[in-house]
UniProtKB/Swiss-Prot annotation:
This is Exosome complex exonuclease RRP44. The modification N-acetylmethionine is found at M1. GO terms for cellular component: cytosol; exosome (RNase complex); nuclear exosome (RNase complex); nucleolus; nucleoplasm; nucleus. It comes from Mus musculus. Component of the RNA exosome complex; within the complex interacts with EXOSC4, EXOSC7 and EXOSC9 of the exosome core complex (Exo-9). The catalytically inactive RNA exosome core complex (Exo-9) associates with the catalytic subunit EXOSC10/RRP6. Exo-9 may associate with DIS3 to form the nucleolar exosome complex, or DIS3L to form the cytoplasmic exosome complex. Exo-9 is formed by a hexameric base ring consisting of the heterodimers EXOSC4-EXOSC9, EXOSC5-EXOSC8 and EXOSC6-EXOSC7, and a cap ring consisting of EXOSC1, EXOSC2 and EXOSC3; DIS3 associates with the base ring of Exo-9. CDD domains: PIN_Rrp44-like (cd09862). Its EC number is 3.1.13.-, 3.1.26.-. It is found in: Cytoplasm; Nucleus, Nucleolus; Nucleus, Nucleoplasm; Nucleus. InterPro entries: Dis3_CSD2, NA-bd_OB-fold, PIN-like_dom_sf, PIN_dom, RNase_II/R, RNase_II/R_CS, RNR_Ribonuclease, Rrp44_CSD1. It comes from the Eukaryota.
Length: 958
């Protein structure tokens, strides 16, 4: 059956075109009920249960299926995801609305419908001839969709009665729309609100905690006192932004001060890049990462950023008065040049709320169901939730979602989502850091796994088309110990003309991950593999990452090869790229490869190849450094785990060998060669990576630190910086050069992916290369998969597709990759920090030598080389006499009583674990040497204050 819709549309050129849309209706779409003989199993995929069970509702004691409307899916997804909610019919009408309004919720509901244990069934009511309806004259789209949902619910009930007359099976409409519910009841459709239905499930009282209360009736504060200004409607905000009255930007809350935030303005005007927001009323219920509209205050009301550290310790609505008292502390007299553009939030353009991890702060009122939740992320305000399981949730990590923030409430309202486990447990804390850094880590869905090759897999004749057979070459891989996702392998051999052939062979992941399918979409969403201390979150399923794509030894593998002909001076004479098949002759660790190179007794083909590669790598590195490439340093920690408990039993810095540098040089060379090739072929659509030069002010701390040791660091170019660092040696202080390079690393900007057609600056500052990309790690970086596809098209080994040559879509991919890469780094650091805490928890009190990296007004920041660990030694203690402190920003130095501390001075510190705040345990450091009366803590004396409950956070003045 065919319906068509005809309408006229005005074109951009001013013309008029006639549009005809065809809409096909069918009579063979299954209802999803196994008992239905009429549909004859026409439904495919996950279906409803024959006899719905485990839904003992006091309102509906008979067997039933649920049919939620759009708003229930959008706002009560936490309820629907609970294991007790099964046998749900999701209409096509509802899915389309959810998809248009919230991509994250749409993804979650798709995951639920793909879970066969949940028995969710998607019914395509818009193409069923019995349930499709036309929009009536004068009816808006929302009312039409509500009617379509009621029509489908009514059809289901009548249909099930016809096919199973003796069955009591019914379909219940779940809607929070009062008018929709009234109309449904009038039409004879069983209908309840989500709250009514959930409260009727007496066997699952915990479900009530998951309810999102959208109207603020349930969470109104009894006093009713208005605290915040009303948010302006979106139409007024858009008018104001267009006229210039308001500015649009991203709200960034402060970690250090809950009464302060900044708004990063969306636009090109540099002078309006950042607006300061100060004070609880000016923040006006904005939450970190929300897109907001701000009004710039008159210049007379501009303020300076506060140096005061303030944590929100309030418990009730009266705390607003305390907040206002605290705001007065922020307003201190400062010079005119310290003032910053200041504004106030007038409206919310887009909420970017997510589920938050944290802990419950149980109410002091006995039997109270309302409690405050304290998020782990200090940038998020406390959230008021209603729960009946407060006692069971004490001391545990939980997830809470925000529902809304009424004007008369000091805190937003939310609901309990999930109990993650006990604070301090490894599994719990790992889950928290993954969730808090937005690292996708759910198991791969069946839809994704369906695109994997079937096992057993082998290379076919079809696979060999457009490929070179390089299995005869002596190829080997060199990686860290325990590496299973081997991306790259190398070879070097002498040619008959006396030159050398060098090959970098990279796993051909793009052969297995084809554009646009579910596997490709999931890989693009994840963006990168995340390496934690004890866990790896793969970007692609394990079958690919550790098996079919991994270039393991003695198995045939598909590769993408970059092959150079070089002379013995490492000068490139020819470069070619080819899809290939290789058979690695050895999977070596860096230590094993180094041993082969150094051993005079070993002269086999693999060792000869490694020696050739190593010699060329040294020449390549020398050439890069002469051009101005930077050799920086950062302390990397490696844990040794107990084989049974998996707790860290040793902590040491990572050891680097010549072979680390050897592999790095050829990966850099391959990336540069590929970048040139794809940019030649796709000048507007190449995915590249750039590293911006830091602004001169970034180097101030490095220049001052070097000056304190009578050394001069020049920073006008990367070459002058590299040369200065090379000359900065001290025979009496061999670690000085490493410290300078660590400081130089802190001065750098973040490298980012970008589309060549959207930017003119390609330069990579750190590598001193005019162009660069990522080609060598496609198992763990999605950027490399895109680069592989571009290169394959460039050499005629594969065909293109529309998205590959769409610079706007490529730019969006780059934004996601940059975000995922940054979040992965933060998650890795959080994992190291947690395992460091575990290590020192078991070690007790430890004293070690350290070097000062920074001096502050009331503290020194030190680095402990043995552990690669950084920490802060404070010199002001609460409830203790304050020492005489004199800070000099120019040198920089800090005088305490009679002792002066400079950057890079050697000290001895005591390291302990501060467990006074369960949610934010941290490593504390105290000075042991040099001796300062009233400051030092003898190395053999435990600092009980550090582990006593109720310890207050000390303020670090910058």
């Amino acid at each position: 059956m065919l319906r068509s819709k005809t309408f006229l549309k005005k074109t951009r050129a001013g013309g008029v075109v006639k549009i005809v849309r065809e809409h096909y209706l069918r009579d063979d779409i299954g209802c999803g009920a196994p008992a239905c003989s009429a549909c004859g199993g026409a439904h495919a995929g996950p279906a409803l249960e024959l006899q719905p069970r485990d839904q003992a509702s006091s309102l509906c004691p008979w067997p039933h299926y649920l049919l939620p409307d759009t708003n229930v899916l959008l706002h009560q997804i936490d309820v629907l995801e609970h294991p007790a909610i099964r046998n749900v019919i999701v209409l096509q009408t509802v899915m389309q609305e959810v998809r248009n309004r919230s991509a994250p919720i749409y993804k979650r509901i798709r995951d639920v419908t793909n879970n066969q244990e949940k028995h969710f069934y998607t019914f395509t009511n818009e193409h069923h001839k019995e349930t499709y309806i036309e929009q009536e004259q004068g009816e808006n789209a929302n009312d039409r969709n509500d009617r379509a949902i009621r029509v489908a619910a009514k059809w289901y009930n009548e249909h099930l009665k016809r096919v199973a007359a003796d069955s009591q099976l019914q379909v219940i409409l779940i809607t929070n729309d009062r008018k929709n519910k009234e109309k449904a009841v009038q039409e004879g459709i069983p209908a309840f609100t989500c709250e009514e239905y959930v409260k009727s499930l007496t066997a699952n009282p915990e479900l009530i905690d998951r309810l999102a209360y959208l109207s603020d009736e349930m969470n109104e504060i009894e006093s009713g006192k208005i605290i915040f200004s009303e948010h302006l409607p979106l139409s007024k905000l858009q008018q104001g932004i267009k006229s210039g009255s308001y500015l649009q930007g991203t709200f960034r809350a402060s970690r250090e001060n809950y009464l302060e935030a900044t708004v990063w303005i969306h636009g090109d005007k540099e002078e309006e890049k950042e607006i300061l927001i100060q004070g609880i009323k000016h923040l006006n219920r904005a939450v970190h990462e929300d897109i907001v509209a701000v009004e710039l205050l008159p210049r007379s009301q501009w303020v300076a950023p506060s140096s005061v550290v303030l944590d929100d310790e309030g418990q009730n609505e009266d705390d607003v008065e305390k907040d206002e008292e605290r705001e007065l502390l922020l307003k201190t007299a400062v010079s005119e040049k310290m003032l910053r553009p200041t504004g106030r939030v007038v409206g919310i353009i887009k909420r970017n709320w997510r589920p938050y991890c944290g802990m419950l702060s149980k109410s002091d009122i006995k039997e109270s169901r309302r409690h405050l939740f304290t998020p782990a992320d200090k940038r998020i305000p406390r959230i008021r939730i209603e729960t009946r399981q407060a006692s069971a949730l004490e001391g545990r990590r939980i997830i809470v979602a925000i529902d809304g923030w009424p004007r008369n409430s000091r805190y937003p309202n939310g609901h309990f989502v999930k109990n993650l486990g006990d604070v301090g447990e490894k599994e719990t804390e790992t889950e928290v850091l993954l969730l808090e850094h937005d690292v996708p880590h759910q198991p791969f869905s069946q839809a994704v796994l369906s695109f994997l090759p079937r096992m057993p897999w082998s290379i076919t004749e079809e696979d060999m088309k457009n490929r070179e057979d390089l299995r005869h070459l002596c190829v080997c891989s060199v990686d860290p110990p325990g590496c299973t996702d081997i991306d790259d392998a190398l070879h070097c051999r002498e040619l008959s003309n006396g030159n050398l052939e060098v090959g970098v062979h990279i796993a051909d992941v793009s052969h297995f991950i084809r554009p646009g399918n579910a596997l490709d979409q999931e890989s693009a969403r994840r963006g990168t593999t995340v390496y934690l201390c004890e866990k790896r979150i793969d970007m692609v399923p394990e079958l690919l990452s550790s098996n079919l794509c991994s270039l393991r030894s003695n198995v045939d593998r598909l590769a993408f090869s970059c092959i150079w002909e070089m002379n013995h001076n490492a000068e490139i004479l020819k470069t070619r790229f080819t899809k290939s098949v290789i058979n690695s002759k050895a999977s070596l660790t860096y230590a094993e490869a180094q041993m082969r190179i150094d051993s005079a007794a070993m002269n086999d083909d693999i060792t000869t190849s490694l020696r050739g590669l190593n010699q060329l790598a040294k020449i390549l590195k020398k050439g890069r450094i002469e051009k101005g490439a930077l050799t920086l340093s950062s302390p990397e920690i490696r844990f040794h785990m107990d084989s049974e408990t998996h707790d860290p039993i040793d902590l040491q810095t990572k050891e680097l060998r010549e072979t680390n540098s050897m592999v790095e040089e050829f990966m850099l060379l391959a990336n540069i060669s590929v970048a040139k090739k794809i940019h030649e072929e796709f000048s507007e659509h190449a995915l590249l990576r750039k590293h911006p030069a830091p602004p001169p002010s970034n180097y101030d701390i490095l220049v001052k630190a070097a000056k304190s040791k009578n050394l001069q660091i020049k920073t006008d170019t990367a070459k002058s910086l590299a040369d200065s660092l090379d000359r900065a040696e001290s025979p009496d202080f061999p670690y000085l050069n490493t410290l300078l390079r660590i400081l130089a690393t802190r001065c750098m900007m973040q490298a980012v992916y970008f589309c060549s057609g959207m930017d003119n600056d390609f330069h990579h500052y750190g590598l001193a290369s005019p162009i660069y990309t990522h080609f060598t790690s496609p198992i763990r970086r999605y950027a490399d998969i895109i680069v592989h596809r571009l290169l394959a098209v460039a050499i005629g080994a594969d065909c293109t597709y529309p998205e590959l040559t769409d610079k706007h879509k490529l730019s969006d991919i780059c934004k996601n990759l940059n975000f995922r890469h940054k979040m992965a780094q933060y998650a890795q650091r959080a994992s190291v920090a947690f395992h460091t805490q575990l290590f020192f928890k078991s070690k007790g009190i430890v004293s070690e030598e350290a070097y000062i990296l920074f001096v502050r007004k009331n503290a020194i920041v030190v680095l402990i080389p043995k552990y690669g660990l950084e920490g802060t030694v404070f010199f002001e203690e609460k409830d203790k006499p304050k020492p005489r402190l004199a800070y000099d920003d120019e040198i920089p130095s800090l005088r305490i009583e009679g002792t002066v501390f400079h950057v890079f001075d050697k000290v001895k510190v005591k390291i302990t674990l501060d467990s006074s705040n369960l949610q934010h345990q941290k490593i504390r450091m105290a000075l042991v040497e040099p001796q300062i009366p009233g400051i030092n803590i003898p190395p053999n004396v435990a600092d009980k204050a550090l582990t006593a409950p109720g310890g207050k956070k000390r303020k670090l003045e910058k």
